[in-house]
Swiss-Prot record:
Keywords: Isomerase, Magnesium, Metal-binding. This is Hydrophobic dipeptide epimerase. Part of a large, functionally divergent protein family. Protein modeling and substrate docking was used to predict the substrate specificity, prior to biochemical analysis. Catalyzes the epimerization of various hydrophobic dipeptides, such as L-Ala-L-Phe. Has epimerase activity with L-Ala-L-Thr, L-Ala-L-Met, L-Ala-L-Tyr, as well as L-Phe-L-Met, L-Phe-L-Ser and L-Phe-L-Thr (in vitro). One of its GO terms (molecular function) is magnesium ion binding. One of its GO terms (biological process) is peptide metabolic process. CDD domains: L-Ala-DL-Glu_epimerase. Binds 1 Mg(2+) ion per subunit. InterPro entries: Dipeptide_epimerase, Enolase-like_C_sf, Enolase-like_N, Enolase_C-like, Mandelate_racemase_C, Mandelate_racemase_N_dom. The keyword Isomerase applies. Substrate binds at residues 143, 168-170, 277, 329-331. It comes from the Bacteria. Gene3D superfamilies: Enolase-like C-terminal domain, Enolase-like, N-terminal domain.
C-alpha cells in the first residue's frame, strides 16, 4: 500500500563519469558515461533518484532531448502530492513516447522515493513471478567488448581470476577475429558459460555458419543475443528453428523494446529468450514483458545500457523482486571509474546480495 508524499523539489541534470576503457560493440562505442539523472525530494527531506542511460546508436534518443523531457517532468512534479507512485508513472508515459530511457529515469525516481518513504527495499515493489520469495543473491556475467585478441584474453584472465562464471562476448565486426576471441575466452575459462552478443551484426546464414565453426572447436554458447537486424524477424525465426533442441537459446534484444514487440516475438516463435532492459521499455512495461515471457515459457535475461551503479542496482532489485531471470547482464559498473561505479550490493566477484538491503534502491548520486 502506497503512502502519500509531496514533492517539494525536483531537478534533472547530466552527470558524466570516465570509463576505464572504451566500451565497443558492433554498432558503436561509449568513451564515457553521459547520463541524465533525476532527483525528487519530499517536503520531509526524503529523496528518490532515477537515471536515464541514453544509447543514441541503438535507440536514437539523445541526451539533450532526454534532459528536456525530464526537466519538464520535474517542473510538473514540484509541489505535487503523489498518492500512488505507479499511477503517477503511468500518467507521464505519453509525454515520454520515443524516450524510454527518460521514462525509466522518471519511474525509477518515483518508485525509489515511494519505497524510501514506505521504508522498504526497492525490490519489494515487484512481486515474484513464479517463486514464493524474492531471489536476493545472484551473479552477473562480464562483457568482453569488441577489441583485439589480446584484449579479450586479458579480460578473460582478469575476471576468471575473480570468479566470474559467465562471459558475454561482443561480436559482429570481424568474423575471423571474433572466432579467435571466443576461442581464447573459452580456453582461459573452459568451465564458464559463453554468451554471444552480435548486436545485429550478422545475417541468419552467416550466424549459423559462425556457430558451426565454433561447434567444430567444441564451443557451444548457452545464449545468442540479437544476431540479426532488429526488424529481421524471419532471420531470427530461421536461427531459432535451426537451434531448437540445441544448447543455445536465441535471445531478442534490440528487436524487443515494448510489450507489443515481446508479443510478436513470442507468438511468431522468433526467439527462445528475451533481454529486458529498463532503458528500452521503462521499468513498469519491462515488468509486464517479463511476466508475459515467463508465462509463455520464454527464458529471460536482464540487461543494461551504459549505466551507473544507480540504474544497475535498481535492476538488481528488479531481478530480486520478480525472481524470474535466467541470465543477468548487469556489469557496466566494472567499466566505470569513480563513485558512480559503486553499488553497495555488488562485490568484486560480480555477486549481488540484497539480503541486507535498506529502504529504496540504496544509491544516492551527487548532484552539482
Amino acid at each position: 500500500m502506497d503512502i502519500s508524499f509531496q514533492i517539494q523539489d525536483a531537478v534533472a541534470s547530466v552527470i558524466r563519469a570516465p570509463l576505464a576503457s572504451p566500451f565497443r560493440i558492433a554498432t558503436g562505442q561509449h568513451d564515457e558515461l553521459e547520463n541524465v539523472f533525476l532527483k525528487l525530494t519530499t517536503r520531509d527531506g526524503v529523496s528518490g533518484y532515477g537515471e536515464a542511460a541514453v544509447a543514441s546508436h541503438i535507440t536514437g534518443e539523445t541526451v539533450p532531448g532526454t534532459l528536456a523531457n525530464l526537466q519538464n517532468a520535474a517542473a510538473a512534479l514540484r509541489g505535487q502530492t503523489v498518492d500512488d507512485a505507479e499511477s503517477a508513472c503511468r500518467q507521464f508515459a505519453a509525454a515520454f513516447a520515443g524516450n524510454h530511457a527518460g521514462l525509466a529515469a522518471l519511474e525509477m525516481a518515483l518508485l525509489d522515493l515511494s519505497s524510501r518513504v514506505r521504508g522498504i527495499p526497492f525490490y519489494r515493489l515487484f512481486a515474484p513471478v513464479a517463486a514464493l520469495e524474492p531471489r536476493l543473491a545472484f551473479s552477473t556475467d562480464i562483457t568482453v567488448v569488441i577489441g583485439s585478441l589480446d584484449e579479450a584474453r586479458a579480460t578473460a584472465r582478469e575476471f576468471a581470476s575473480r570468479g566470474f562464471k559467465a562471459f558475454k562476448i561482443k561480436i559482429g565486426r570481424d568474423e575471423q577475429l571474433d572466432l579467435a576471441r571466443v576461442l581464447a575466452v573459452h580456453e582461459i575459462a573452459p568451465d564458464s558459460q559463453i554468451i554471444l552478443d552480435a548486436n545485429m551484426g550478422f545475417s541468419a546464414g552467416s550466424m549459423l555458419a559462425f556457430l558451426d565453426r565454433l561447434a567444430a572447436k567444441g564451443v557451444r554458447p548457452v545464449l545468442l543475443e540479437q544476431p540479426v537486424p532488429k526488424m529481421d524477424w524471419d532471420g531470427l525465426s530461421e536461427i531459432t528453428a535451426a537451434l531448437t533442441g540445441s544448447e543455445t537459446l536465441v535471445c531478442a534484444d534490440e528487436s524487443v523494446g515494448s510489450l507489443a514487440d515481446a508479443r510478436r516475438a513470442i507468438d511468431s516463435n522468433a526467439v527462445s529468450a528475451i533481454n529486458v532492459k529498463f532503458m528500452k521499455s521503462g521499468i513498469l512495461e519491462g515488468a509486464e514483458i517479463a511476466r508475459l515471457a515467463a508465462s509463455r515459457g520464454i527464458r529471460l535475461m536482464l540487461g543494461a545500457m551504459m549505466e551507473s551503479a544507480l540504474a544497475v542496482t535498481a535492476s538488481a532489485h528488479f531481478a530480486a523482486g520478480l525472481a524470474c531471470f535466467d541470465y543477468l547482464d548487469m556489469d557496466t559498473t566494472f567499466f566505470l571509474k569513480g563513485e558512480l561505479a559503486h553499488s553497495p550490493y555488488l562485490d568484486e566477484h560480480g555477486r549481488f546480495d540484497l539480503h541486507d538491503a535498506g529502504p529504496g534502491i540504496g544509491v544516492e548520486p551527487r548532484f552539482s
